[in-house]
C-alpha cells in the first residue's frame, strides 16, 4: 500500500463538501492519489456537529476503521471539521491512529500537515486556532477539471448564536472573504467551463457586514457575480431571514441568471419558539419576505429547514409549524429532531421532550412535506424547462435494463440517459434516442412524469 494514497469521508453541509473537494485537489497537486477506502493509507474524515446524529456517526466510523485496519501498518487517520474543532486533541487520547485534527479554519493548512505526517511517522498535529481573517487558500482548479456546477465560499463562521446552534463555536465568528477573491475564483471557474455557481456561507445575507468586509454588500456581490460573461446560473445558500435585504429580494427580479429557488430556514412556525431559539424574526416578518419574493419572481420555489421538539415546544406550537408549511408552502424542507449541542443556550433550557414525542412529530411533519413536495413535482408535468446536465443518470433513475450506466462506464461520459437540474433545482432524468455526451450542456426538456424525488422528461430541442 502506497503511503501517499488517501480517501476522504465527508459529513454535513455543502460547505464541508466544498472543503473536502478542495482538500482532494490540494493533495493531488502534492502528488497524493485519491483511492477507494480499503486501498488508502490516509483516511480523512471531515465532520459535522450541528446535530448529535452525525457526530455519533463519526465516532462509529473511527471505531470501524480501527477494527478493520488493526493488522495494517502505517495507517493514518485525520479528523477535520466541526467535531474536530469541538473535541480537538481529545481524539489523540481516544484513537491511536488519529494523527491530525484540524478545525474549520485549519483546513487551509491541512495539506502541508499531511505532507509532514508522511515524512515524520510519529508526529501528531493539531490545527485548531481560528484565524483573524478569512482563511484564503489557492482554489487549485488548475490541478483538476472544473465542475459544471461549482460552489464558492464567500464567508466563514457566524455571529448569530441561535440558542440551539453550535456553529459559532465550531466555525468561529463571521469573516467575510474579499469580494475581489470571490470574483476572481468565479471568473476562473466560468472561464474553465462552469456554467452554474452557488455562493456559500453560514449567513450569506450578512456578507460584508463584519469588520473583515471590504464594503461590498451581498446584493452588490450578487450583481457582480451575475455579470460574469458565460455564467448561466447563479444560486446561493444559506440566508438568514432576519438579514435578508430588500436589494437581495429585488435581485430575483432583476438578474435573469439568478435561479428562482431560495433556501429560507424557518425552523419553527411558532413565534414563541422562534423567540426562544433567538432567531430574531417572527412569522409575520418571514411571510412578508415570502410575499415579496413571490411578487418579484412569481415562479420562485422556497425550501426550508425545520426543527421539531425544541425545548418547551407544545402541541399548539407544533401545529403552528404545520400551518406555516401549508401557508408558504415549501417545495422541500430539511427537518430534524432537536438534539442538545454542548455549550449552547438551549442545552440548559427546561421542558425537554421525550424522544418518542419528538419522533412522532417529525413523522407528522414529513407527511405534510411529502404531500407538498409531490404536488410541486406533479405540477411540472407537461412543462418545458431548460436542464443543465451534470452526469449520466444512475441506474435507479434511468430504469432497470437501460444502457446508461454501462455506456457511461465504457466510453467516459457518453450515455443514453442523463441527469440534470432545471433552474428551479428540480432533478430531471432524460432518456435519449442515442448515446451522447451532454455533460455541461443545457437542453430544453419536456417533463413527462413525476417520480418521488425527481422528474423524467424527453428532449424538446437541441443542446447548447
UniProtKB/Swiss-Prot annotation:
Family from the record: Belongs to the methylthiotransferase family. MiaB subfamily.
Entry's cofactor comment: Binds 2 [4Fe-4S] clusters. One cluster is coordinated with 3 cysteines and an exchangeable S-adenosyl-L-methionine.
Quaternary structure and interacting proteins, as annotated: Monomer.
The Radical SAM core domain, residue ranges: 144-375
Entries under NCBIfam families matching the protein: miaB-methiolase (TIGR01574), MiaB/RimO family radical SAM methylthiotransferase (TIGR00089)
Nucleus recorded as keyword: no
Molecular function per GO: 4 iron, 4 sulfur cluster binding; metal ion binding; N6-isopentenyladenosine methylthiotransferase activity
Segments of this protein annotated with the region Disordered: 393-420
EC number: 2.8.4.3
UniProt superkingdom: Bacteria
A Gene Ontology term for the protein's cellular component: cytosol
Stretches assigned to the MTTase N-terminal domain: 4-119
Cell compartments where the protein resides: Cytoplasm
Residues annotated to bind [4Fe-4S] cluster 1: 13, 48, 82
Residue numbers binding [4Fe-4S] cluster 2: 158, 162, 165
Described purpose of this protein according to its UniProt entry: Catalyzes the methylthiolation of N6-(dimethylallyl)adenosine (i(6)A), leading to the formation of 2-methylthio-N6-(dimethylallyl)adenosine (ms(2)i(6)A) at position 37 in tRNAs that read codons beginning with uridine.
Protein name as it appears in the record: tRNA-2-methylthio-N(6)-dimethylallyladenosine synthase
Keyword terms of this UniProt record: 4Fe-4S, Cytoplasm, Iron, Iron-sulfur, Metal-binding, S-adenosyl-L-methionine, Transferase, tRNA processing
Swiss-Prot/TrEMBL cofactor(s): [4Fe-4S] cluster
UniProt main location, coarse: cytoplasm
Keyword Kinase attributed: no
Catalytic activity: N(6)-dimethylallyladenosine(37) in tRNA + (sulfur carrier)-SH + AH2 + 2 S-adenosyl-L-methionine = 2-methylsulfanyl-N(6)-dimethylallyladenosine(37) in tRNA + (sulfur carrier)-H + 5'-deoxyadenosine + L-methionine + A + S-adenosyl-L-homocysteine + 2 H(+)
Amino acid at each position: 500500500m502506497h503511503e501517499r494514497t488517501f480517501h476522504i469521508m465527508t459529513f454535513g453541509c455543502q460547505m464541508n463538501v466544498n472543503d473536502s473537494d478542495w482538500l482532494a485537489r490540494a493533495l493531488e497537486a502534492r502528488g497524493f492519489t485519491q483511492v477507494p477506502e480499503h486501498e488508502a493509507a490516509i483516511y480523512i474524515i471531515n465532520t459535522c456537529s450541528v446535530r448529535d446524529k452525525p457526530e455519533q456517526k463519526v465516532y462509529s466510523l473511527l471505531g470501524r476503521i480501527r477494527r478493520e485496519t488493526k493488522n495494517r501498518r502505517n495507517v493514518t487517520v485525520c479528523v477535520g471539521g466541526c467535531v474536530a474543532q469541538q473535541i480537538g486533541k481529545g481524539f489523540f487520547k481516544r484513537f491511536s491512529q488519529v494523527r491530525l485534527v484540524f478545525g474549520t479554519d485549519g483546513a487551509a493548512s491541512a495539506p502541508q500537515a499531511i505532507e509532514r505526517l508522511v515524512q515524520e511517522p510519529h508526529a501528531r498535529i493539531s490545527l485548531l486556532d481560528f484565524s483573524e481573517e478569512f482563511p484564503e487558500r489557492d482554489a487549485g482548479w488548475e490541478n483538476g477539471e472544473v465542475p459544471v456546477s461549482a460552489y464558492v465560499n464567500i464567508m466563514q463562521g457566524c455571529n448569530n448564536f441561535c440558542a440551539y446552534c453550535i456553529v459559532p463555536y465550531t466555525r468561529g465568528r463571521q469573516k467575510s472573504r474579499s469580494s475581489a477573491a470571490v470574483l476572481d475564483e468565479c471568473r476562473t471557474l466560468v472561464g474553465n467551463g462552469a456554467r452554474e455557481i452557488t455562493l456559500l456561507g453560514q449567513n450569506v445575507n450578512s456578507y460584508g457586514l463584519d469588520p473583515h468586509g471590504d464594503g461590498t454588500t451581498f446584493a452588490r456581490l450578487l450583481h457582480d457575480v451575475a455579470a460574469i460573461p458565460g455564467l448561466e446560473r447563479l444560486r446561493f445558500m444559506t440566508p438568514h431571514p432576519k438579514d435578508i435585504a430588500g436589494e437581495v429580494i429585488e435581485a430575483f427580479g432583476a438578474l435573469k441568471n439568478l435561479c428562482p429557488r431560495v433556501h429560507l430556514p424557518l425552523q419553527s412556525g411558532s413565534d414563541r419558539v422562534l423567540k426562544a431559539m433567538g432567531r430574531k424574526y417572527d412569522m409575520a416578518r418571514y411571510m412578508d419576505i415570502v410575499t415579496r419574493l413571490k411578487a418579484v419572481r412569481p415562479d420562485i420555489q422556497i425550501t426550508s429547514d425545520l426543527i421539531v421538539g425544541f425545548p418547551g415546544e407544545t402541541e399548539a406550537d407544533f401545529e403552528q409549524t404545520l400551518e406555516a408549511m401549508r401557508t408558504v408552502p415549501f417545495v422541500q424542507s430539511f427537518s430534524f429532531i432537536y438534539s442538545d449541542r454542548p455549550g449552547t443556550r438551549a442545552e440548559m433550557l427546561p421542558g425537554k421532550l421525550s424522544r418518542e414525542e419528538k419522533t412522532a412529530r417529525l413523522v407528522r411533519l414529513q407527511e405534510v412535506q411529502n404531500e407538498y413536495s409531490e404536488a410541486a413535482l406533479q405540477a411540472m408535468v407537461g412543462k418545458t424547462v431548460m436542464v443543465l446536465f451534470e452526469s449520466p443518470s444512475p441506474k435507479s433513475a434511468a430504469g432497470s435494463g437501460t444502457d446508461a450506466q454501462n455506456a457511461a462506464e465504457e466510453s467516459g461520459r457518453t450515455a443514453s440517459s442523463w441527469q440534470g437540474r432545471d433552474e428551479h433545482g428540480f432533478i430531471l432524468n432524460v432518456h435519449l434516442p442515442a448515446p451522447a455526451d451532454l455533460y455541461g450542456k443545457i437542453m430544453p426538456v419536456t417533463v413527462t412524469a413525476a417520480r418521488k424525488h425527481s422528474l423524467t422528461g424527453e428532449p424538446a430541442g437541441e443542446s447548447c
